[in-house]
């Protein structure tokens, strides 16, 4: 920081001095010299204080595993300076442009020849029915071309090449030799807000409930996960009707705090909505202003995570819970007061005895089938949308760019299956910002960002309305889940018995339904 900037940052105050009792001009010079020395000393002390603060903040961010800045060779920094998100949106407009009918067949055949697409697998072999390149990228295949392995508990969700796979060591995924990233950076931390609840078209009927119970029994999946990604339901707390505001605050702040991005310099305390469900109106009225939901904050009316919101929109921070003695005023205070031990309550930190966490990273080339399917018989409980960059995910760049998959825009699907925790993370890439989840119409990716989001932020939606007995959306192995365009990467992180061994190897090409 330059001296002039330090001077302006310190803001010294000058005061008038009565010179009648000091002997005139000589005394005036002495006073000016004294004030100048005080300014220099104060500026130096301020610089030391700022330096210590930055070091402490860096260490705390390292403990929270949310430092995901671009790091690599000079080519990486050059690439990070390009407007890749804007280029991807322009490319998306080009892909959606309708082609003349007479150009479709030769154009798609040329593309298939260049990128090695197998046109004999198309569900609709008539190329004139594909109006544009986007329709062709998201083409459907005949079901018999992708048989699902009947034995393996985990199968490939996509067509692609395995970049890396193995065991999660010390809560980190070893991407390539010397490059790794933490699960918190990839999947996020404790959800600190009451997330959006997705409504489904299927009506809850006794037949549907029975079907879901049979699904859980057949695949040995537990019922009602009780939202393992958040703190325990505060409605179980016993609260005296005549408790004062502070006592009631302590009763409910087992839930993580959250703040709204429309006021970055103030952190507001709210009692999560789930805590109000079983409380009488008289107790509600005693919550006070600090526990009352904001009047302009309605979770039920959120229209998805569209980035084209106004400045008063609500983006939720991922932050560990911590009962604070005072209200933090900014992000630095949150980092300082964060209780890192709350990270241990995340499901991937609480695996079953005798189990381990495994991962598999599969890269999709531009000519591959661009839809992703379910890797197992599991229940998708929630999804988290991380708005990020759109770097290329090619193996060439993946070997050179640190934290590639935690820098890029992605959607993390979290849930459970027979052996415990299961997650599938479709990762966006250059020209592939659009990610679609079939059961979630509220998801909107690669939208124009009017304001850069903070580190570790994500928008979360839960699927508990899909099933009252499973608290999520049940999907079977090989069932289509969603898709993206042109080429990207899918990361699997799942829990399995310690003796689990991959039947595939690094660099192998796999197809949907094949055993991993």
UniProtKB/Swiss-Prot annotation:
Uppermost EC category: lyase
Mitochondrial matrix face of the membrane: 22-33
A Gene Ontology biological process term: phosphatidylcholine biosynthetic process
UniProt GO MF annotations: phosphatidylserine decarboxylase activity
Mitochondrial intermembrane topological domain residue ranges: 53-516
Transmembrane domains' residue ranges: 34-52
Annotated catalytic residues: 159 (charge relay system), 373 (charge relay system), 488 (charge relay system), 488 (schiff-base intermediate with substrate)
Site (Cleavage (non-hydrolytic)): 487-488
Function statement: Catalyzes the formation of phosphatidylethanolamine (PtdEtn) from phosphatidylserine (PtdSer). Plays a central role in phospholipid metabolism and in the interorganelle trafficking of phosphatidylserine. Together with psd1 and psd3, responsible for the majority of phosphatidylethanolamine synthesis. Plays a role in lipid droplet biogenesis at the endoplasmic reticulum membrane.
Name of the protein in its database record: Phosphatidylserine decarboxylase proenzyme 2, mitochondrial
């Amino acid at each position: 920081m330059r001296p002039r900037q330090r001077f302006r940052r310190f803001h010294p105050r000058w005061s008038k001095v009565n010179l009648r009792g000091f002997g005139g001009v000589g005394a005036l010079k002495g006073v000016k010299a004294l004030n100048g020395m005080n300014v220099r000393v104060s500026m130096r002390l301020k610089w030391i204080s700022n330096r210590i603060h930055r070091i402490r903040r860096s260490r705390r961010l390292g403990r929270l595993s949310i430092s995901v800045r671009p790091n690599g060779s000079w080519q990486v920094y050059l690439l990070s300076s390009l407007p890749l998100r804007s280029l991807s949106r322009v490319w998306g407009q080009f892909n959606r442009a309708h082609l003349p009918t007479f150009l479709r067949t030769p154009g798609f055949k040329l593309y298939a020849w260049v990128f090695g697409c197998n046109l004999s697998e198309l569900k609709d072999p008539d190329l004139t029915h594909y109006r544009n390149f986007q329709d062709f990228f998201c083409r459907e295949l005949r079901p018999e071309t992708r048989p699902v392995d009947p034995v393996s508990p985990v199968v490939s969700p996509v067509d692609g090449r395995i970049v890396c796979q193995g065991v999660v060591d010390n809560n980190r995924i070893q991407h390539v030799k010397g490059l790794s990233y933490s699960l918190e950076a990839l999947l996020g931390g404790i959800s600190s807000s009451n997330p959006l609840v997705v409504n489904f078209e299927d009506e809850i009927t006794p037949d549907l409930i029975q079907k879901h119970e049979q699904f859980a029994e057949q695949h040995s999946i537990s019922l009602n996960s009780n939202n393992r990604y958040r703190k325990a339901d505060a409605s179980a707390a016993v609260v005296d009707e005549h408790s004062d505001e502070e006592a009631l605050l302590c009763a409910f702040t087992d839930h993580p705090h959250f703040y709204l991005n429309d006021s970055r310099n103030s952190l507001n305390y709210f009692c999560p909505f789930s805590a109000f469900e079983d409380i009488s109106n008289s107790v509600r009225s005693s919550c006070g202003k600090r526990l009352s939901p904001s009047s302009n904050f309605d979770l039920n009316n959120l229209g998805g995570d569209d980035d084209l919101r106004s400045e008063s929109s609500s983006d939720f921070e991922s932050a560990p819970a911590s009962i604070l003695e005072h209200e933090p005023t900014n992000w630095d205070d949150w980092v300082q007061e964060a209780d890192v031990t709350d990270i241990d309550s995340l499901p991937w930190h609480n695996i079953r005895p005798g189990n381990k966490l495994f991962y598999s990273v599969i890269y999709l080339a531009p000519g591959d089938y661009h839809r992703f399917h379910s890797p197992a018989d599991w229940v998708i409980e929630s999804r988290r949308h991380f708005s990020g960059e759109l770097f290329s995910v090619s193996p060439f760049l993946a070997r050179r760019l640190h934290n590639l998959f935690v820098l890029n825009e992605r959607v993390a699907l979290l849930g459970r299956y027979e052996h415990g925790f299961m997650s599938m993370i479709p990762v966006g890439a250059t020209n592939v910002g659009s990610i679609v989840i079939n059961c979630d119409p509220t998801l909107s990716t690669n939208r124009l960002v009017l304001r850069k989001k903070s580190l570790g932020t994500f928008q979360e939606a839960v699927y508990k309305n899909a099933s009252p007995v499973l608290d999520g959306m049940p999907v079977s192995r090989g069932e289509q889940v969603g898709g993206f365009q042109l080429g990207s990467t899918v990361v699997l992180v799942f829990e399995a018995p310690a003796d689990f061994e991959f039947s595939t190897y690094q660099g192998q090409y796999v197809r949907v339904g094949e055993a991993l």
